[in-house]
Amino acid sequence: MSIKADRWIKRMAQEHGMIEPFVDGQVRGGVVSYGLSSYGYDIRIADEFKIFTNVNSAIIDPKNFDPRSFVDVKADVCIIPPNSFVLCRTIEYFRIPRNVLCVCVGKSTYARCGLIANVTPFEPGWEGYVTIEISNTTPLPAKIYANEGIAQVLFFEGDELPDVAYDDRSGKYQGQTGVTLPRI
């Protein structure tokens, strides 16, 4: 399994729609950077946020998720309460090839502020907008910015095709379009 370089990412995005919209190169200058990098793609977050709160004293249960656990916010910035987290989604829509696995890691700009981006791997054959969890590990409120970079996706090409890919087994998050809550 090898990591894929910018040339491969660009070709797959432009010829196969692997990333839409696709930004060819790094956008910087007053924003948290995003776009194509040497061995990855820096993704952006949309302006839709689910901020978790304890206002209603709900319990987080992945098998019986209570929508009173969060408040919905649509804005250019999101303030994450201390020691809390927010769910958001990417601007980019991904179509992962059958022989590729993607791993997503946080950007250093946010990591140095105590913010952790958590995303499960993008499995072979998966497609959709990526739901991202951003944890504020600090005792202070923290700000994140819509339409700017949040994390980097790394693309690994397998040596052979899997017997069963995500789309073959009708994965529960296939084709997700918004900030998607846990499903069983």
UniProtKB/Swiss-Prot annotation:
Pathway: Pyrimidine metabolism; dUMP biosynthesis; dUMP from dCTP (dUTP route): step 1/2
Biological-process GO terms, alphabetical: dUMP biosynthetic process; dUTP biosynthetic process; nucleobase-containing small molecule interconversion
GO molecular function: dCTP deaminase activity; nucleotide binding
Disulphide-bonded residues: none
EC number(s) stated in the UniProt entry for this protein: 3.5.4.13
Organism: Herpetosiphon aurantiacus (strain ATCC 23779 / DSM 785 / 114-95)
Binding site for dCTP: K107, S108, T109, Y110, A111, R112, Q152, Y166, Q176
Assembly behavior: Homotrimer.
Protein name: dCTP deaminase
Residues at the active site: E133 (proton donor/acceptor)
Keyword annotations from UniProtKB, A to Z: Hydrolase, Nucleotide metabolism, Nucleotide-binding
